[in-house]
């Protein structure tokens, strides 16, 4: 009898196991928790991914740093948390008897070894694995900078400069082209500027409207120095600057407003949220200043008035998730500005509207696709005048209107081969149509009308192979660009005089550019790595250089419809060091660049009134030098950083046209040989937030013949602030604390030189609102 019962009990036991296993497999658990930083503050907007076997799900922490996975099909697994400015965290979890899991995820600040950049390779790459010279600025570092305008923030990066030392507060838009590594002696940019992968360099003129991207919308700014045409084509001759904006998650609102001397109010904000599969963000910025008089006291006359400006921008982005690993979005941007350029008559204004669409889609674990399309319409007005020698009178010489239309698109595919290789391939196209419609005047009389312009189309195909094996990183990339100029003409209609030259229709032109790049990084140990790169890059002449003339003071610079593309051959080598438990980071890079056919403003007749210059292909210039960057994290609150750039940019080959002056051996205009920057920061929001910066800029020349020098100068900036609550901060800031009045322009006149001076001491007081509170 006893033996007969054994099979019955055994069967019941097996059924119990099977039933219990089935019940457990159908059971779901609740996983919840909070994300905090090492100081205990909550971290909103963190990305949390949960895995349990084949089950995967992700979410974002809310304004209180909390997250919930309500129905997880599993009893144990792994959670991965990531947030901007922090290192990644992985934590295992196991459900208790009540089928609930409570987690506290503590993120630590990211070191330079964990920072990620996208500009150098067009795909996410750790900064320490990126060959080349890259500087990354977080939104905390931007807020800690006393400068009000974004271009002034970037001046702390050695090698960065704008044409004529000018800034976006008071400078004419056409003077705001950006240069890296001393490659530009004219106003056209030699570096590509992007916002979330889309170009914001003016396609017609090559300058940059720095204020069209609201400052509070910025999450990071990346500066990649060195030729990057292998990925980005024309404009990336000297590197890439990319603005990366905030991405909406939990409801958030960030605002900065201030008021300063020269009657300067400023307001910038960003707000965004996510609801289900939809996300939306809105950003805007408004600025106005009465400005200051550009001409020094001893040269001023009755016509000299303050150079003032006002601008406004608004940007709306709406996105929607596509499945678990995709997103489509649309963005609209409107920007307007108006400027007085130092006299009553001389003004300019711009109105710009842009729309873009984008798709980001990941396929499986190794493939992703990115698509972008955009269009822009812009109108630019400019008034020029002739100023009398005593500067007590002026007369209108030119009314200029520049209409511009731009369309473009790009596609990129990225494929991962295991853990050690990444392939990138893509294509992009941009077409711009623009003209310069002008009314010319002489002694108050309307003498003639002119219309010059055309169309330009650039199509590029690129590919890149990133290989990471042990301590080696090798990147090989190449790109082919085909650029075409067509429908170009220069027309003249006499009104009360004659035309200086007949109307002409220019033949269509096309050219090809091949831009390869090879970069290598070798990690010697945990502290040292060495890098090296060789590359070619190019820049096609803009429609502005080809077809538009302009006047500054007593200098007229004419266009040149026969310009060729600039071609650069470059090499660089560098050393990176990280020590003292990653509290000390040092980088040094030597670079060498040789440019054939650089486009410069060449003086044709220095004795004429006005002085005559023309945009010409100069022959060949060479820019070589050294970049040094370093930062010491003394403690969590204290940081000291410094940077230095030495740039020797000279003309090494020049065929002298009959009757002109040889430029052989001259320094390239607008390029300082020495730039040194430093910053010391104590950042403890509950006590005080203090930042002090200094910048030294060495001697340079304003002209191609090296006859009009601009002397060296040193400025200091200062900011102090404190949190009133976790979400509200008060601050005061001062730029040019020493009130150094340095020269930014030295232009020839019939009687000698006319100088323009930089800004005086500028100060402001303001408030910042961050909801939810950001990590400082």
Where are these regions (language model features)?
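Membrane-embedded beta-barrel scaffold of Gram-negative outer-membrane proteins
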Residues: 370-384, 435, 529-535, 539, ...
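Extracytoplasmic beta-strand/coil segments of soluble accessory domains associated
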Residues: 134, 151-202, 219
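Short, acidic, small-residue-rich periplasmic hinge/interaction motif at the N-terminus
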Residues: 36, 47, 51, 82-86, ...
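Short acidic/polar hinge/loop motifs at secondary-structure boundaries
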Residues: 198-225, 306
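Gram-negative outer-membrane beta-barrel transporters
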Residues: 468-474, 482, 587, 591-595, ...
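Periplasmic-side early beta-strands and strand-to-turn transitions of outer-membrane beta-barrels
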Residues: 229-230, 242, 249-258, 270-351
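Signature of Gram-negative outer-membrane beta-barrel scaffolds
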Residues: 420-525
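C-terminal beta-signal and adjacent terminal beta-strands/loops
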Residues: 292, 538, 594-596, 601, ...
């Amino acid at each position: 009898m006893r033996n007969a019962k054994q099979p019955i009990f055994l069967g019941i036991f097996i059924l119990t196991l099977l039933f219990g296993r089935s019940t457990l497999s159908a059971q779901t658990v609740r996983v919840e928790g909070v994300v905090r930083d090492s100081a205990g503050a909550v971290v909103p907007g963190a990305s949390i991914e949960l895995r349990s076997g084949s089950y995967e799900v992700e979410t974002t922490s809310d304004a209180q740093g909390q997250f919930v996975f309500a129905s997880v099909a599993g009893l144990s697994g792994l959670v991965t948390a990531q947030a901007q400015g922090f290192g990644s965290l992985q934590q295992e979890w196991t459900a208790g008897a009540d089928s609930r899991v409570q987690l506290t995820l503590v993120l630590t600040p990211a070191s330079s070894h964990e920072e990620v950049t996208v500009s150098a390779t067009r795909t996410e790459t750790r900064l320490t694995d990126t060959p080349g010279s890259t500087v990354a600025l977080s939104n905390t570092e931007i807020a800690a900078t006393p400068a009000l305008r974004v271009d002034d923030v970037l001046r702390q990066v050695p090698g960065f400069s704008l044409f004529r030392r000018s800034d976006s507060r008071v400078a004419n838009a056409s003077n705001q082209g950006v240069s890296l590594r001393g490659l530009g002696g004219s106003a056209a940019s030699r570096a590509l500027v992007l916002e979330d992968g889309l170009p914001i360099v003016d396609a017609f003129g090559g300058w940059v409207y720095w204020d069209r991207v609201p400052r509070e919308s910025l999450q990071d700014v990346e500066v990649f120095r060195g030729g990057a045409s292998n990925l980005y084509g024309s404009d990336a001759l000297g590197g890439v600057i990319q603005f990366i904006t905030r991405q909406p998650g939990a409801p958030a609102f960030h605002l900065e407003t201030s008021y300063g001397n020269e009657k300067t109010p400023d307001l910038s904000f960003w707000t965004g949220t996510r609801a289900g599969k939809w996300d939306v963000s809105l950003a805007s910025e408004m600025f106005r200043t009465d400005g200051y008089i550009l001409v020094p006291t001893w040269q001023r006359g009755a016509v000299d008035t303050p150079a003032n400006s006002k601008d406004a921008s608004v940007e709306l982005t709406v996105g929607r998730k596509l499945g678990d690993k995709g997103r489509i979005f649309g963005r609209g941007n409107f920007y307007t500005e108006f400027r007085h350029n130092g006299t009553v008559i001389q003004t300019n204004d711009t109105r710009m509207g842009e729309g873009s669409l984008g798709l980001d889609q990941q396929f499986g674990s190794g493939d992703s696709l990115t698509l972008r399309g955009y269009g822009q319409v812009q109108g630019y007005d400019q008034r020029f005048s002739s100023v009398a020698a005593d500067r007590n009178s002026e007369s209108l010489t030119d009314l200029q209107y520049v209409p511009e239309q731009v369309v473009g698109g790009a596609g990129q595919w990225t494929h991962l081969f295991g853990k050690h290789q990444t392939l990138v391939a893509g294509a992009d196209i941009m077409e711009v149509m623009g003209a310069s419609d002008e009314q010319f005047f002489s002694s108050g009389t309307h003498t003639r009308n002119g219309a010059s312009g055309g169309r330009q189309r650039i199509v590029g195909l690129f590919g890149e192979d990133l290989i990471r094996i042990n301590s080696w990183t090798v990147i090989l990339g190449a790109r082919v660009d085909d650029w075409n100029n067509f429908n170009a003409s220069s027309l003249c209609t006499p009104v009360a005089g004659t035309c200086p030259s007949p109307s002409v229709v220019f033949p269509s032109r096309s050219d090809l550019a091949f831009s390869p790049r090879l970069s290598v990084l070798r990690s010697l140990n945990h502290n040292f790595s060495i890098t090296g790169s060789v590359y070619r890059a190019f820049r096609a002449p803009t429609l502005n250089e080809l077809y538009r003339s302009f006047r500054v003071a007593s200098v007229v610079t004419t266009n040149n419809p026969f310009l060729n593309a600039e071609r650069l051959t470059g090499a660089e080598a560098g050393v990176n060091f990280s020590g003292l438990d990653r509290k000390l980071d040092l980088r040094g890079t030597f670079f060498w660049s040789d440019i054939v056919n650089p486009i410069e403003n060449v003086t044709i007749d220095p004795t004429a009134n006005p002085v005559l210059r023309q945009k010409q292909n100069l022959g060949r210039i060479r820019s070589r030098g050294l970049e040094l960057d370093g930062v010491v994290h003394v403690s969590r609150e204290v940081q000291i950083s410094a940077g230095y750039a030495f740039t020797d940019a000279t003309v090494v080959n020049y065929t002298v046209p009959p009757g002109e002056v040889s430029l052989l051996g001259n320094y390239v205009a607008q390029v300082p040989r020495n730039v040194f920057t430093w910053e010391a920061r104590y950042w403890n929001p509950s006590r005080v937030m203090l930042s002090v910066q200094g910048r030294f800029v060495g001697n340079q020349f304003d002209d191609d013949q090296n006859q009009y020098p601009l002397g060296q100068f040193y400025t200091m900036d200062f900011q102090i602030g404190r949190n009133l609550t976790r979400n509200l901060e008060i601050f005061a800031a001062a730029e040019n604390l020493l009130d150094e009045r340095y020269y930014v322009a030295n232009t020839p006149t019939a009687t000698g030189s006319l100088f323009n001076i930089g800004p005086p001491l500028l100060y402001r007081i303001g408030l910042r609102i961050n909801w939810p509170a950001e990590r400082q």
